[in-house]
Amino acid sequence: MTAASPADEHAMRLALDQAHNAWLVGEVPVGAVILREGKVVATGYNRPITTHDPTAHAEIVALRHAAELLSNYRLPECELYVTLEPCAMCAMALMHARFKRVVFGAPDPKTGAAGSVLDLFAVEALNHHTELVGGVLAEPCGDLLRGFFTERRAERLAERLAERRADRLADRSALGRAGLAELAGDEDAPAPIPTGEATELPADSLLPPT
């Protein structure tokens, strides 16, 4: 990996803006920006959930936009900035597109393919090698992801608690209905007195005079 520059940090902040957009629509907050000669060509953020497309990672979304705009699937003059270390799918797509440089923010210890789990960018047998920079604004990039998942866990916990409360209320209601049904089937049980109506009781049910 090579060192980052102030220009890299500026571009990564643009990618962070895209990551915030992903959060707003309920997606895992990962954002990407593609630059050519220092100018923004395309942007993208995670969209697998909203598009029902498992390949719609931020890098792929931005890559598709750039390729369409530039009318070329090869982008050798372009650099891509992404807030999370690329997975194997994205890493290979970026190399197939012949990107000059890839810069990422936070490492991904579960699926990262730029050094965390494996490093596809370092495989010498591949026919194209892309310059790689990692850890640019890693802390804010990671904080955004941690905040998102903390919020998601809290929401799921609240949903489970609400479901349990609803189940308890339903159980109590069912027990109450069962009790009324049991009384209704008891021949010796007195008939319920309608609310707001006077009812004359049978003579044999009256208390003897004192």
Model-identified regions with their sequence ranges:
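Zinc-dependent deaminase
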Residues: 1-22, 92-210
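A short, polar/acidic, helix/strand-boundary loop motif
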Residues: 2, 48-49
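Short beta-strand scaffold segments in enzyme catalytic cores
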Residues: 30-38
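Short beta->alpha transition motifs characteristic of CBS
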Residues: 41-48
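Small-residue (primarily alanine) positions within well-ordered alpha-helices
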Residues: 15, 19-22, 32, 42, ...
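Immediate flanking context of iron-sulfur cluster ligation sites
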Residues: 72-84
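A short, polar/charged loop-to-alpha-helix boundary motif
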Residues: 50-61
